[in-house]
């Protein structure tokens, strides 16, 4: 009895099919896909056979039965003698092996795939080497134009256009968004425009002198207008008709009298009849 019980698990193990290895399953799948491709190609080569036979009154060329081929992978193929041989000779080249596009950091020389400066400013610098407070500092568009004497065309139209990021104004939220540029790229672009640092400094000095001259000119104009306003007010006061206010009259001699204006000192002499 015990021997019979021990034989049952062994018989059950023999009845269960063994699982095929992964390589065998992959080979079977490739052969199945190839069989489907050959069948589709054969059908596409003669899509109008029934229609052509009906058009010729039922007369059609009768071909021999297709050749049956055992692929050895569990599939049976019906292969035309000439057409399938041509299709079978087609060799598909394997696709290229995709490799990661690594970028070399210009600071440390190490390879990296992604970084903040590379994504936003096309600067090959990894996040570990990023110096946000000094070398890789960001400046506003207004500061770039005032400090480095750049115009809008120098930033946006000169090749290559400089990249920037847009952020809300932290001081005035109701104002428009700020455009922030990489200071390192702004300095490089200013040297391209002005040629050298010395030429840039000379241009800044000339612009500062012109700005001071304009301020002095505006100041002189305001002083001139103020003087003109004062003179015109004095002239207007002088043109007003003066009304004399005479004091008591004085008797000079026979029937002659005199009185003096208390405001301007004008003397009026007259005779009483």
Swiss-Prot record:
GO-annotated molecular function: damaged DNA binding; protein domain specific binding; protein homodimerization activity; sequence-specific double-stranded DNA binding; zinc ion binding
Modified residues (N-acetylalanine): 2
Phosphoserine found at: 196
Binding site for Zn(2+): 105, 108, 126, 129
Keywords: Acetylation, Disease variant, DNA damage, DNA repair, DNA-binding, Isopeptide bond, Metal-binding, Nucleus, Phosphoprotein, Ubl conjugation, Xeroderma pigmentosum, Zinc, Zinc-finger
Residue ranges of the region described as Interaction with CEP164 and required for UV resistance: 4-97
The name this protein goes by in its record: DNA repair protein complementing XP-A cells
Gene source species: Homo sapiens
Taxonomic lineage from the root: Eukaryota, Metazoa, Chordata, Craniata, Vertebrata
């Amino acid at each position: 009895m015990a021997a019979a019980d021990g034989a049952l698990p062994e018989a059950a193990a023999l009845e269960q099919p063994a699982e095929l290895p992964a390589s065998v399953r992959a080979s079977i799948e490739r052969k199945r896909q190839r069989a489907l491709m050959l069948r589709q190609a054969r059908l596409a080569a003669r899509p109008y056979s029934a229609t052509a036979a009906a058009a010729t009154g039922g007369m059609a060329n009768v071909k021999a039965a297709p050749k049956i081929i055992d692929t050895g992978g569990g599939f049976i193929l019906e292969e035309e003698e000439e057409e399938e041989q041509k299709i079978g000779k087609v060799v598909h080249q394997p696709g290229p092996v995709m490799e990661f596009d690594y970028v070399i950091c210009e600071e440390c020389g190490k390879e990296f795939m992604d970084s903040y400066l590379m994504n936003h400013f096309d600067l090959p610098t990894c996040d570990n080497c990023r110096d946000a407070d000094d070398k890789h500092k960001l400046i506003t568009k207004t500061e770039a134009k005032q400090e480095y004497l750049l115009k809008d065309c120098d930033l946006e139209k000169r090749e290559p256009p400089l990249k920037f990021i847009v952020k809300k104004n932290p001081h005035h939220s109701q104002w428009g968004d700020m455009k922030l540029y990489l200071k390192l790229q702004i300095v490089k672009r200013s040297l391209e425009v002005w040629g050298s640092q010395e030429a840039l400094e000379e241009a800044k000095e000339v612009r500062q002198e012109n700005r001071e001259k304009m301020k002095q000119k505006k100041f002189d104009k305001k002083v001139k207008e103020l003087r003109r306003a004062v003179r015109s007010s004095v002239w207007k006061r002088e043109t007003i008709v003066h009304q004399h206010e005479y004091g008591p009259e004085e008797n000079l001699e026979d029937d002659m009298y005199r009185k003096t204006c208390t405001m301007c000192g004008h003397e009026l002499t007259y005779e009483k009849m």
